[in-house]
Swiss-Prot record:
Biased composition (Gly residues): 156-171
Coiled coil: none
Biased composition regions of type Basic and acidic residues, renumbered to the chain: 1-10
Organism of derivation: Mus musculus (Mouse)
Residue stretches of biased makeup (Low complexity): 126-136, 146-155
PANTHER family: ZINC FINGER SWIM DOMAIN CONTAINING PROTEIN 4, 5, 6, ZINC FINGER SWIM DOMAIN-CONTAINING PROTEIN 5
Gene for this chain: Zswim5
Name of the protein this chain belongs to: Zinc finger SWIM domain-containing protein 5
Lineage of source species: Eukaryota, Metazoa, Chordata, Craniata, Vertebrata
């Protein structure tokens, strides 16, 4: 990294001479109290803080030459080198160097004390676009070369305004956007005056911070110590015992006190300087007073050191000089911010152990954002922190478990791994890293990648994307197999980055100057490097080129990233124009065939490197209005929408009026409109959808002004005319990723400005080719052709349900917008009927159209209402022969919709019922609702209209009864009861069907209806037929048909003796349950027959005898049923049922005693039981006790 080793110095030092004082070499132990000496990484830039830099003079009073020199030396040189370089350093110079060595930028304190940071990620880019940033005026150095002086940390200069060149922060919210964050709490402690006793001795700052008293806790004072070097905090110590990745609030408070109130801090030179000025007596007095003040702590150590010093052979006497913890770092020490590595490991391990919970994923994403923030500040701790995070990820025990079980990781975990891999690509493509650093990272990445548990790039699927550095041109001819690569892990793309470099002269010119144009006299090999306007092109695999942009942007080169982005977009434009020309030559042939095998194997949306998202963010950050009050604390958790402005593109073309914002919109549209084949695997397909939604949410933040609308319209026309190369072309590959979600955004954005274009585009996007009939494979000789890998309809489209729902959302959006426009609604209806294949989704659209057409506060839209009805009718036809759990709801809704349309719609569905409904639905729901009193009132029908509806309903009822008498006979009778002829026909249908497949319950139901309507003889006939279909076993005493049997017997009894005599043989034949038979017998003997008979018949007035016909037959059957049931129950009876059995015999005796000789018959029956079942002694004892 930039600060990972010494760069070009301000002065060229002569050969190192011995130090002027041997008692001032720094102590590593003192600098690293937590045991992390020499931590890898580096520090952030020292740009100015949110307030005036410490000791800075008013604007009109320039800094003194001493301060200017001291600031630079304090930032660039270790103090030991200063001492070695100059034999004598005046005390005022020493004081200014020590003074300026403390960090000057509050942002850096915030970065190490908070996950969140509100510094406007586009700060650097915006400044770079305006040409105001003092950072990186030249191109980034190639890997391994020394970076320019301006690229080192703090190159922005101590006096530069916040955000210029060093603006970072990828997480939303304020620096400490929550009350509990250390940075926020540190500011509160500082503002409340809790920081006291601040003392700076050389490169060591100390003080006390008092936590105010709480309701249940007293005030507590903590001692805080901070060591620093070259504008970086190198170690911290606090009495609170904080265990976290970030600095505690007390360290923050002390640091901010030093930044904001430097003049109130007591400043002393390093303690070795003070000791050097003392004579022997003063030194002795100093030591003795020091020991006296802290004798309990330091006396043993003091005596030990004294013994060693007095011993001539001791190790301490073999070394010149003595350590000084306040003298700053040594030359050999790495200059980096303090980062508690152990806490980073512990925190990541803790978050991973929490599984896929939302909170842990959010925290890990915040850590990734912190890495990006460090990278942009060019802080080498970014790479070190990412290494620590990756080590813990690779140590996650779930990786082994998932591999052993053959299961895939969760989506949330997969997304974290993707971000990890993307960050490593940024690290490897760092334009200012050293070759040895890059080599070290690559070795570690290769080691991780070689492990069996290392996650693969796109799951367990073999089809891979092209290699990052050897990606083939999109116009090359390749089959899927030829693009397959060996096992690719999440680190493979970063490892492939070893082949990329920054030394290409054309690339260097692109990123070094915004006005780089084609030379007047071009050589043969230079003609392809520029477009017709002389603007430079960058002809590289698009995702790889975008990875370069991300690396530049991530490492604090905003202007360079913008320049390369513009070159990439010019290249994409040229490619788009060439594809249009190719399509024009093949348009006629493709339209005749109606199909194509041309496709892009690699999509930019959902790509692991997120090329479109990278370009879009780079461009929009250049246009984002920054909030200068980045240090203000916000108690509001909601994030505010960003505000953008047009920033002109720095271009060598004088007539170019483009802005970065319009380019951002254009490249997003080009990327999402790219035709690409659906990738393999659930995760890859889900990632396509998720990435598209992310890009669209970012697009929706743009306020479309005239310039952006013009860009939008132009790009939409190009997409429509793009043929098979555009996802919105006329003919596309059958497996192309659908454009529904994208088209919905385009439709909504374009509608107020160009309705015709918006509808044309949205209607084109409605298709879902993979569900439509495939045609012939076509000509495979074209370089873009790819034979379909979907032999059947859609075997590998795991996200098909989501895609269909997005298709439905697009149609619903158009329906809402087209309200009142008959022609557009008719066109849209045809598109829906052609392209949407899910009945549930069409039903949803029909419901949406119905709601829009029938608002509660305005008149009904008849055209849209008819569209709703048409969609409903299509749903009925689609689901008529299939199972759908919402079918009844759909039928009821359709009748409601037809009612709203009018009586002609109801008549139409009644007349064509057989194409829409099952017989049961037609009679029980459709016809019944159509002729209901509610419908008549709703439509205010006159008599002829009511009769027409009723006639249609009767015709429907008879047709349904003929087709399905079992289910529709009763409904047909109900619908026809007001028309004698139709009623007779329905009754005859029921009688004819009785001998067929109708069940006893259906016949009993119809019979009861006939009795209710006043047709008892017809009811008796149907009941008799029902009895012939019934069979009640001896133990079915709770059968649901018992009530029907009792009702039938009561009906026959009420009609007269003859009807009862006709029914009893049927009862005896069908019913074998003794209790039911005895109940029937009892009921028949209670009243005389014919009491409730039909008019004209008279009752005999005499009760019927059980000894005579027809009851004698029923009595004998009942007694036999009791006998048979008794024997059946005794076969498997248990003691707990003895009491129940005795009660059963008691009921049986009541029936036995009805005839004159019944008591003898019952006694004989009991004796037989005692003889047959004498082995059941306890039971027989109970029988004797009850019955003798």
């Amino acid at each position: 990294m930039a600060e990972g080793g010494e760069r070009e110095e301000l002065l060229s030092p002569p050969p190192i001479s011995p130090a002027k004082r041997l008692c001032s070499w720094p102590s590593p132990q003192a600098h690293h109290p937590r045991g992390t000496p020499g931590a890898a990484g580096g520090g952030a830039g020292g740009g100015g803080g949110g307030c005036l830099a410490p000791g800075a003079r008013p604007h009109l009073q320039p800094e003194s030459l001493l301060d200017c020199a001291a600031k630079t030396v304090a930032e660039k040189w270790a103090y030991e080198r200063v001492e070695e370089r100059f034999e004598r350093i005046p005390e005022p110079v020493q004081r200014r160097i020590v003074y300026w060595s403390f960090p000057r930028n509050e942002r850096e304190i915030c970065m190490y004390s908070s996950f969140q940071y509100r510094g406007g990620p586009g700060a650097g880019a915006a400044a770079g676009a305006a040409g105001a940033s003092p950072v990186e005026e030249g191109p980034p150095p190639p890997p391994g070369a020394a970076a320019p002086a301006g690229s080192a940390p703090g190159a922005a200069g101590a006096g530069s305004s916040p955000g210029l060149g060093a603006g970072t922060g990828t997480a939303s919210g304020g620096c400490g956007g929550g009350e509990g964050l250390p940075f926020r709490r540190g500011i509160r402690l500082l503002d409340s005056g809790s920081v006291e006793n601040v003392l700076q001795v050389g490169f060591h700052l100390s003080g006390t911070v008092t936590e105010p008293a709480m309701a249940s806790e007293p005030a507590v004072t903590y001692k805080v110590a901070i060591s620093f070097d070259r504008c970086k905090i190198t170690s911290v110590s606090c009495g609170c015992g904080n265990k976290d990745i970030f600095y505690c609030a007390h360290v923050v408070a002390l640091s901010l006190y030093r930044i904001r109130k430097p003049d109130q801090v007591k400043l002393r030179l390093p303690i070795s300087e003070t000791l050097f000025q003392m004579n022997r007596d003063q030194l002795q007095k100093f030591i003795q007073y020091l020991i006296t003040a802290h004798h309990t702590e330091v006396l043993p150590t003091a005596q030990k050191l004294a013994d060693e010093i007095l011993s001539s052979n001791s190790e301490i006497n073999q070394v010149n000089g003595a350590p000084d913890p306040t003298a700053g770092a040594s030359i050999d020490d790495e200059n980096c911010w303090h980062l508690d590595e152990e806490q980073v490991k512990e925190q990541v391990k803790l978050f991973l152990s929490q599984g896929g919970y939302y909170g842990s994923g959010k925290q890990l994403n915040s850590m990734f954002a912190k890495v990006r923030e460090m990278l942009r500040m060019r802080d080498s701790n970014g790479a070190r922190m990412l290494t620590l995070i990756t080590e813990q990820f690779m140590a996650d025990p779930r990786l082994t478990l998932w591999r052993q079980q053959g299961t895939s990781m969760t989506d949330k975990c997969r997304q974290l791994w993707d971000e990890l891999g993307a960050l490593w690509v940024c690290i490897i493509l760092n334009p200012h890293c050293k070759l040895e650093e890059k080599s070290c990272w690559l070795q570690q990445l290769q080691k991780w990648s070689d492990l069996d548990i290392c996650p693969l790039e796109d799951g367990n699927y073999g089809h891979e994307l092209p290699n990052i550095t050897n990606a083939l041109s999109q116009s090359a001819s390749h089959s899927p197999d030829s693009l397959s690569r060996p096992r690719r892990t999440v680190f493979t793309r970063a490892i492939e980055g070893r082949e990329l470099h920054w030394q290409d002269s054309h690339l260097q010119r692109i990123i070094s100057s915004g006005i780089y144009t084609a030379p007047a006299c071009q050589r043969e090999n230079e003609r392809l490097l520029f477009n017709s306007h002389g603007q430079p092109l960058w002809l590289e695999h698009v995702p790889t080129a975008c990875a370069r942009v991300d690396a530049l942007r991530s490492h604090g080169y905003p202007k360079e990233a913008l320049r390369l982005t513009v070159a990439i977009i010019n290249t994409l434009r040229l490619q788009q124009q060439r594809q249009l020309e190719i399509y024009k030559h093949q348009k006629k042939e493709l339209l005749q065939r109606g199909t194509t095998t041309i496709t892009n194997l690699e999509g930019w949306v959902g790509h692991p490197l997120d090329p479109i998202g990278c370009l879009f963010l780079t461009l929009t950050e250049a246009c984002r209005l920054n909030d200068d009050s980045y240090m203000e604390m916000s108690d509001m958790n909601e994030s505010r929408l960003p505000v953008y402005q047009h920033v002109p593109v720095a271009s060598g073309c004088p007539n170019s009026n483009e802005s970065y914002l319009s380019l951002a919109l254009e490249v997003a549209l080009m990327g999402m409109g790219q035709q690409r084949v659906m990738p393999e695997g659930l995760y890859a397909q889900d990632k396509v959808c998720r990435n598209e939604e992310q890009l669209l949410s970012q697009l929706q933040e743009l306020q479309l002004d005239d310039e952006l609308v013009q860009t939008l319209r132009k790009q939409c026309i190009l997409l429509l005319e793009g043929g098979p190369f555009s996802g919105l072309g006329e003919v596309i590959h059958r497996e192309s990723v659908p454009m529904h979600t994208f088209a919905k955004y385009l439709f909504s954005a374009l509608l107020p400005h160009d309705p015709d274009l918006s509808y044309k585009l949205a209607l084109r996007a409605m298709r879902l080719p993979v569900l439509e009939n495939s045609s012939s494979a076509g000509d495979t000789s074209h370089p873009h052709h790819m034979v379909s890998v979907v032999p059947s309809r859609y075997p590998r489209w795991f996200t098909l349900g989501h895609l269909e729902s997005q298709q439905c959302e697009l149609a619903s959006t158009m329906l809402t917008a087209a309200k009142g426009d008959t022609l557009r609604l008719r066109t849209l209806l045809e598109a829906i009927q052609k392209h949407i294949h899910s009945p549930s989704l069409i039903f949803k659209l029909a419901q949406d159209a119905f709601k829009i057409a029938t608002p509660t506060d305005s008149s009904t839209d008849g055209t849209l209402l008819n569209v709703a009805l048409e969609l409903g009718l299509q749903v009925m036809r689609m689901t008529l022969s299939t199972l759908n759990w919402r079918r009844r709801e759909m039928v009821r809704w359709l009748v409601t919709c037809a009612t709203e349309v009018g009586v002609r719609a109801l008549v139409s569905i009644l007349q064509s019922w057989y194409t829409l409904f099952t017989p049961t639905e037609a009679t029980s729901i459709v016809a019944a609702t159509a002729v209901s009193h509610t419908t008549i009132l709703r439509l205010s029908l006159d008599y002829p209209q009511r009769e027409e509806l009723a006639s249609c309903a009767r015709t429907l009822a008879l047709q349904c009864a003929m087709k399905d008498p079992q289910s529709c006979a009763l409904s047909a009778l109900t619908l026809c009861e007001k028309d004698h002829i139709a009623f007779e026909a329905a009754y005859q249908i029921a009688i004819d069907a009785a001998a067929g497949g109708m069940t006893h319950s259906q016949l009993f139901t119809i019979a009861r209806y006939m009795e209710l309507r006043g047709y008892p003889l017809r009811a008796f006939k149907l009941a008799s037929l029902a009895m012939s279909h019934l069979n009640l076993a001896y133990n079915q005493d709770t059968h649901p048909a018992i009530n029907d049997v009792l009702w039938a017997c009561a009906l026959s009894h009420s009609l007269g003796k003859n009807e009862l005599a006709a029914l009893i043989p049927l009862v005896v034949k069908s019913v074998h349950c003794a209790t039911v038979l005895s109940d029937i017998l009892r009921r028949c003997t209670v009243t005389a027959p014919g009491l409730a008979g039909i008019p004209g018949r008279r009752s005999s007035g005499k009760l019927m005898s059980t000894d005579k016909a027809p009851l004698r037959q029923l009595l004998d059957a009942t007694i036999n049923a009791y006998i048979n049931t008794t024997h059946s129950r005794l076969t498997h009876i248990s003691p707990r049922h003895y009491g129940e059995f005795i009660e059963f015999l008691s009921k049986a005796r009541e029936t036995f005693l009805l005839p004159q000789d019944g008591h003898l018959q019952f006694a004989q029956f009991i004796d037989n039981l005692k003889q047959i079942y004498k082995g059941k002694k306890k039971l027989m004892l109970l029988v004797r006790e009850r019955f003798g």
